[in-house]
């Protein structure tokens, strides 16, 4: 395993060789400088989709294989992607910052998203930007979200949402100068064999509620209790946010405690370096972040994030004009 990761070894760790890295950089620069519009525009995404097909065949095969089977860890790291580290401005310090203008990072993220499915975003979250900054923000150190710097608990991205992302992509533009900040991932495929029978039974039962963040302002009745495990009993999907999922029975509470303990025991920590892209299978893998101490001097850790939906059609009722941004509620007929 690469020196900047800790925990159980992943079989999905791809380093681009020099020729592949140079080709991807050439394609990304061309997209960033020649595509019409901005990364949030449909024509820019279409240009990214077309550009994806020019990527090295071996890299496209690697990602196609990951899309079909994300493996026992439910995550892959691509190393050696272009991010223009020397040309980066200071790390943003503003809550809700996003990448609206064309950039090398936006090109890499949206091309990769088109290779896995379609990019997607949620209007109540960072105003629906397809490429979002993940940076520490002064005064939000204890926040359980991407702007914080305290320990971020394990969660599926937007676990409360019917159309939560299938994949979460995090591209490192600038590493944490202290070396402490790390993406943590834990996969249900590692955890399931370790759980007691009683905990497994409880996790399959509709005894959990997961609240949305206040920004979504969802109306209507409170969501009915739902299970944490979904789908096939031998290879289930996972729907949980340890900061927002509440048990409605005592056995559910005990099951969450055991689940969290095994997440911690099996977690892989990825201390991403510039040009490294982590892709998390949000269906089977939770993610979080280690604690770190920001400097707020322009050199702090800077990731950019894009969500991927593998079946964009399913969310059509929530996407005005058949775009890539989901609103807070279905559109009226």
From Swiss-Prot:
GO biological process: antibiotic biosynthetic process
Cofactor dependence: Fe(2+)
Keyword flag Oxidoreductase: yes
EC number: 1.14.11.39
Class of enzymatic activity (EC top level): oxidoreductase
Residues the record lists as binding 2-oxoglutarate: 301
Pathway info: Antibiotic biosynthesis; calcium-dependent antibiotic biosynthesis
GO function terms (MF aspect): iron ion binding; oxidoreductase activity
Residues where Fe cation binds: 155, 157, 287
Keywords from the named record: Antibiotic biosynthesis, Iron, Metal-binding, Oxidoreductase
Cofactor binding, per record: Binds 1 Fe(2+) ion per subunit.
Domain of life: Bacteria
Ligand binding (L-asparagine): 125, 146, 157-158, 305
PANTHER family recorded: GAMMA-BUTYROBETAINE HYDROXYLASE-RELATED, TAUD_TFDA-LIKE DOMAIN-CONTAINING PROTEIN
Family of the protein in this entry: Belongs to the clavaminate synthase family.
Name of the protein in its database record: L-asparagine oxygenase
Origin species: Streptomyces coelicolor (strain ATCC BAA-471 / A3(2) / M145)
Gene name, Swiss-Prot/TrEMBL: asnO
């Amino acid at each position: 395993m690469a020196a900047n990761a800790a925990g159980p070894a992943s079989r999905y760790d791809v380093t681009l060789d020099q020729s592949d890295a140079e080709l991807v950089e050439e394609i990304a620069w061309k997209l960033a400088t020649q595509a019409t519009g901005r990364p949030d525009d449909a024509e820019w995404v279409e240009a990214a989709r077309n550009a994806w097909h020019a990527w090295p065949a071996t890299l496209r095969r690697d990602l196609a294989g990951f899309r079909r089977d994300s493996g026992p860890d439910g995550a892959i790291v691509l190393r050696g992607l272009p991010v223009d580290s020397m040309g980066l401005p200071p790390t943003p310090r503003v809550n809700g910052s996003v990448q609206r203008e064309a950039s090398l990072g936006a090109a890499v993220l949206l091309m990769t998203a088109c290779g896995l499915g379609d990019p997607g975003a949620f209007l109540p979250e960072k105003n629906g930007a397809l490429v979002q900054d993940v940076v520490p923000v002064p005064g939000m150190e204890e926040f359980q979200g991407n702007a914080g710097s305290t320990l971020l608990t394990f969660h599926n991205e937007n676990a409360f949402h019917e159309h939560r992302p299938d994949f979460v992509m995090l591209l490192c533009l600038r590493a944490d100068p202290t070396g402490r900040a790390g993406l943590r991932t834990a996969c249900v495929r590692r955890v399931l064999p370790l759980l007691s029978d009683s905990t497994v039974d409880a996790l399959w039962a509709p005894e959990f509620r997961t609240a949305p963040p206040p920004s979504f302002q969802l109306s209507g009745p409170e969501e009915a209790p739902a299970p944490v495990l979904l789908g096939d009993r031998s290879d289930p999907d996972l729907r949980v946010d340890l900061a927002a999922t509440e048990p409605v029975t005592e056995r559910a509470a005990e099951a969450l405690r055991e689940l969290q303990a095994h997440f911690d025991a099996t977690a892989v920590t990825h201390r991403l370096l510039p040009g490294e892209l982590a892709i998390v299978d949000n269906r089977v893998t939770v993610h979080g972040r280690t604690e770190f101490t920001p400097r707020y001097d322009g050199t702090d850790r800077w990731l950019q994030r894009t969500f991927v939906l593998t079946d964009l059609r399913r969310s059509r009722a929530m996407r005005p004009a058949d775009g890539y941004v989901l609103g807070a509620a279905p559109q009226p007929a």
